């Protein structure tokens, strides 16, 4: 078929580098009503999240299984990022990626907010749901907050605590209240025993 005379309308927004982080999320929020976009997606270009992503790609961790091969924790700044990276390259390259970034060590923006707010004593925010909790987490971040290596280590240690708590609670069969029991339990542990907890040790061992 001859499509020479077909005209396709397009709206193109040219954004300068200096304002990209500010404008791109707003464009996504206000112009796209046809695709389901989650609130957390609007923060994808946040400098804070970009820094967490950078750290997750450069920091090696001990293999909790005792193997000599070290691993990394994959922070998924954009949805589907892990699957996209895993599918790249040859089969051997894909296998190497999975060895380096095991699926169990993948976490998203909303996961990060859940672990941090549980530890900080805001389980009631976590209980409101992933998107609402993420909004509150980002709102409470100090302006220009950027994690360093030690902050990333501490966060992974908090993840390890949360995930272990989740497994224990799951075995107790709390049914539909599991999510609430887990976040409130982690908040209680942090509140009562924070001074005695050595996050660096958990990070070094990659387990409690």
Pin down the residues of each PLM region.
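Accessory terminal alpha-helical modules
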Residues: 2-208
């Amino acid at each position: 078929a001859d499509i020479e005379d077909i005209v396709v309308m397009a709206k193109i927004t040219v954004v300068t580098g200096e304002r990209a982080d500010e404008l791109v999320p707003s464009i996504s929020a206000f112009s796209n009503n046809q695709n389901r976009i989650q609130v957390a997606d609007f923060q994808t270009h946040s400098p804070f999240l970009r820094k967490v992503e950078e750290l997750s790609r450069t920091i090696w961790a001990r293999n909790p299984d005792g193997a000599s091969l070290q691993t990394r924790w994959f922070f998924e700044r954009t949805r589907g990022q892990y699957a996209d990276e895993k599918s790249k390259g040859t089969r051997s390259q894909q296998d190497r990626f999975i060895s380096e970034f095991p699926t169990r060590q993948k976490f998203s923006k909303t996961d990060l907010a859940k672990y941090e707010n549980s530890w900080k004593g805001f389980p009631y925010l976590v209980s409101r749901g992933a998107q609402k909790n993420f909004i509150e987490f980002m709102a409470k971040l100090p302006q220009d907050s950027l994690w360093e290596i030690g902050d990333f280590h501490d966060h992974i240690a908090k993840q390890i605590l949360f995930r272990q708590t989740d497994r224990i609670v799951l075995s107790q069969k709390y049914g539909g209240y599991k999510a609430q029991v887990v976040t409130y339990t982690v908040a209680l542990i942090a509140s009562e025993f924070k001074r005695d907890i050595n996050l660096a040790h958990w990070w070094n061992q990659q387990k409690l």
